[in-house]
């Protein structure tokens, strides 16, 4: 078999400069990938006070220890929520990826309620939709840890509202295809957050914590001011 040997001069000025530039970009990527986690974990005292795990803690306990978790759409929404690179939150309010639960490869979605109470942004919706597509294409069980304030009313758009129907329709398609859709309801979930468990094949609700309602008093006040 022919051997293709590299002729790169790892001591050259060009190589060293490009290597330094690439490492700088890798560090920037790692910082962006970890930004959402950092912001969410800043709310940990609030979760502790409520007797709850943080979204990442709950995800870690769900997944098989030592097995890989491949995140999907880590950079979704970067510089879309805001043009300020220092304030934009890559990944938005959703954690999505492929991991193993009891030895079974699954698509797992987590509402990151440490960021904007887990409300669904446009970018978060795209990330969730992509996870649903992968679940259908690859025939992987769809598992959703639900705690969401519903749609992002502070940045409401008609386009975002109309595209939201695809998220719920996809759950029906998964169920029709015989792919299990499982929701773990572990906090308050309003409006769209209530649709997710409502359209699931199996729902596990945490006693005293899991609540789902289409429009509770806080949502009505936020939407109408009354």
Q: Where is each model-derived feature located?
A:
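Short alpha-helical segments and helix-capping/turn motifs at coil-helix boundaries
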Residues: 91-95, 127-130, 167, 189
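Intrinsically disordered, low-complexity segments enriched in small/flexible residues
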Residues: 2-106, 112, 117
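Short glycine-rich loop/turn motifs
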Residues: 92-96, 105, 140-141, 168-171, ...
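Flexible beta-alpha connector loops of hexameric P-loop NTPases
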Residues: 114-123, 155-161
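A short, small-residue-rich loop immediately preceding and capping a beta-strand
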Residues: 106-109, 117-120, 140-145, 178-189
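A structural preference for short, pocket-lining loop segments at secondary-structure junctions
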Residues: 95, 99-112, 127-154
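Conserved catalytic cores of soluble enzyme domains
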Residues: 146-226
């Amino acid at each position: 078999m022919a051997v293709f040997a590299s002729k790169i001069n790892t001591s050259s000025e060009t190589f060293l400069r490009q290597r330094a530039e690439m490492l700088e970009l890798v560090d920037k990527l790692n910082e962006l990938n970890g930004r959402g986690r950092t912001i969410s974990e800043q709310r940990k005292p609030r979760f502790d006070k409520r007797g709850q795990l943080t979204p990442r803690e709950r995800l870690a306990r769900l997944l098989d220890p030592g097995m890989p978790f491949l995140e999907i759409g880590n950079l979704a929404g970067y510089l879309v929520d805001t043009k300020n690179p220092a304030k934009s939150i890559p990944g938005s309010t959703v954690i999505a990826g492929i991991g193993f639960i009891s030895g079974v490869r699954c698509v797992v979605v987590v509402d990151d309620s440490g960021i904007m109470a887990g409300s669904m942004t446009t970018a978060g919706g795209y990330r969730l939709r992509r996870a649903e597509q992968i679940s259908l294409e690859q025939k992987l069980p769809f598992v959703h840890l639900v705690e969401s304030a519903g749609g992002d009313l502070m940045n409401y758009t008609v386009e975002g509202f109309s595209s939201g129907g695809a998220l719920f329709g996809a759950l029906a398609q998964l169920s029709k295809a015989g792919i299990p859709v499982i929701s773990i309801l572990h906090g308050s979930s309003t409006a769209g957050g209530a649709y997710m468990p409502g359209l699931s094949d199996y729902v596990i609700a945490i006693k005293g914590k899991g609540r789902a309602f289409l429009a509770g008093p806080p949502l009505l006040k936020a939407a109408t001011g009354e």
